[in-house]
A protein has these predicted regions:
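Phosphate-backbone binding interfaces of nucleic-acid-interacting proteins
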Residues: 1-200, 332, 348-351, 355, ...
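Conserved phosphate/anionic-ligand binding catalytic regions in large, soluble enzymes, centered on
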Residues: 2-3, 7, 82-90, 165-183, ...
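Short, hydrophobic beta-strand segments
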Residues: 2-8, 156-164, 215-223, 355-363, ...
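Glycine/proline-enriched, intrinsically flexible loops and inter-domain linkers
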Residues: 5, 23, 63, 184, ...
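Noncatalytic alpha-helical scaffolds and linker/capping helices
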Residues: 38, 396-465
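Conserved mixed alpha/beta core segments that line enzyme active sites in large multi-domain catalysts
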Residues: 49-77, 236-237, 254-321
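Conserved catalytic alpha/beta cores of large enzymes that bind or transform nucleotide phosphates
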Residues: 124-125, 131, 228, 295, ...
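Terminal amphipathic helices with adjacent charged low-complexity linkers/tails
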Residues: 180-211, 383-413, 417-420, 459
Length: 465
């Protein structure tokens, strides 16, 4: 998993260096594979605004732009061949003397006889994305003349960790923040997921035909969305630094919540759903997936279906037919708990390993689904407008995982650790890890593990480690 150090520090910010943070995380058993800067070395790139555009006198594919944002507030003349160059947009502007990634120096030059005092940049030229279709259009409120590194908060590091299968709870910013908070006895600020009131009555029915495989399914209808709105730059940057490509607001929001909270989600085009949602085992049926491949989904695979067809491979990948697009106005958000034993191995069998399957087969917090859908709803409405219906929760409580009750004996703990730790320190550490104290007597204590720690079920040996 890749994550942005600055994103993590928004939740927990101990007074330690990047090197010390990496060492701590590694010593805690979350092996760090790589640390790299969030942006390649560059200088002299600022936020520019195109003030005027004229056709180049001697080149059909070139235009002459007057650009604000240069030194001392003066406008600079730039010759540009990007098809989206137009008046009013804000773009990265490399002034004369700038250095771009790859040791590319920007100099004053003539292009087909017209003076050019710098360069307007796209994402690929700055090595900050893979969109090579033209200029990188920045948000309208980007302050002209501001250094791009400052504006995008690029003074950051991307840290990649390799987690053991039993620590799926750390596959999110929230989970990592908990660990760092424990290691440093630092306060952790968790993202609030306040309920978003329903403003319409629209909902879908949900039927759990395989409750042992899907014990909780949470859905929410949102209507009247404008999915042509751009994903906010801050969200795109957090996704990029996590190794996730921006694909439009609906998909970006679900990916963002996955990274932030650890709950995989999916967005369906509501108009493509026939009747209600049915969570069932497959019927050896064909399904075209979001990656344009077609698979035959076998009877041992859980699917999300409607009244007439399979819509998605549960916990792995959505189907193409119900995918959202720019013209989608109404969606159904899905946030579910799938049994890890049902998902495990399926992604590999179909050759479809995804961020969602990676988390579901390791175990997702069974109490997270409603909070995640509220968080996604708030973000979606903020970006694209619209109206949300009520949250629909269908569950089979008997099939949901139960938190383990664990008894620790002080003498046994000291024997296994090889050192005696004061009971107050043990209690503090366990509380920070999310455990709840049931009782303490003279010889030890009894605790209930948090819903996100599937690994705390093996008794004293596991907890002593």
């Amino acid at each position: 998993m890749k994550f942005s150090e600055s994103w993590l520090r928004q939740s927990v910010n101990p007074s330690i260096s990047t090197a010390d943070l990496v060492a701590q995380v590694t010593m805690a058993g979350l092996e760090v594979d790589a640390v790299e800067p969030a942006a390649p070395a560059m200088s002299g790139v600022v936020v520019g605004e195109i003030m005027s555009v004229e056709q180049h006198p001697d080149a059909d594919k070139l235009r002459v732009c007057q650009v604000a944002g240069g030194k001392e507030g003066e406008q600079a003349q730039i010759v540009c061949g990007a098809p989206n160059a137009r008046v009013g947009i804000k773009v990265p502007f490399a002034v004369v003397g700038a250095k771009l990634p790859g040791d590319f120096n920007i100099k004053q030059a003539k292009l087909r006889g017209v003076e050019s005092m710098g360069m307007l940049c796209g994402q690929t030229e700055l090595k900050l994305g893979d969109d090579d279709t033209g200029l990188w259009e920045l948000p309208a409120d980007a302050p002209v003349g501001t250094d791009l590194i400052t504006y995008l908060d690029l003074d950051d590091n991307i840290i990649e960790v390799d987690l053991t299968p039993n620590r799926g709870d750390c596959l999110s910013i929230r989970g990592l923040a908990r660990e760092v908070g424990v290691l440093n006895k630092a306060a952790v600020s968790e993202q609030a997921c306040a309920p978003v009131p329903a403003t319409i009555d629209d909902s879908v029915t949900v039927t759990l035909e395989a409750p042992n495989a899907c014990a909780r399914y949470v859905g929410r209808v949102i209507r009247g969305l404008d999915l042509t709105q751009p994903t906010p730059q801050w969200m795109q940057e957090k996704l990029r630094r996590s190794g996730v490509r921006s694909l439009g607001p609906a998909v970006d929001v679900t990916n963002y919540v996955l990274l932030e909270l650890g709950q995989p989600m999916h967005a369906f085009d509501l108009s493509k759903i026939d009747g209600g949602i049915v969570v069932r085992m497959a019927r050896d049926e064909k399904l075209k997936l979001l990656d344009d491949s077609e698979v035959t989904v076998t009877a041992d695979t859980l699917v999300i279906a409607d009244q007439s067809k399979a819509l998605a491979m549960a916990g792995i990948m959505g189907g193409d037919e119900s995918a959202v697009g720019d013209d989608t106005t109404d969606i159904l958000f899905e946030s579910a708990w799938f049994n890890p034993l049902v998902i495990a191995g399926k992604a590999r069998n179909y050759g479809k390993h995804t961020d969602s399957s990676h988390r579901f087969e390791r175990g997702v917090d069974a109490q997270l689904q409603v909070a995640a859908i509220e968080r996604a709803t708030a973000l979606m409405l903020e970006i694209c407008g619209g109206n949300a219906g009520p949250v629909v929760v269908e569950e089979s409580a008997e099939h949901l995982p139960q938190s383990a009750t664990i008894t620790l004996r002080d003498n046994r703990l000291a024997q296994q650790l090889g050192v005696s730790i004061p009971a107050a320190d043990v209690d503090d550490m366990l509380v920070r890890l999310g455990l709840s104290l049931v009782e303490r007597d003279n010889g030890g204590s009894t605790w209930v593990a948090p819903s996100w720690r599937f690994d705390l079920t093996l008794g004293l040996n596991q907890n002593a480690s």
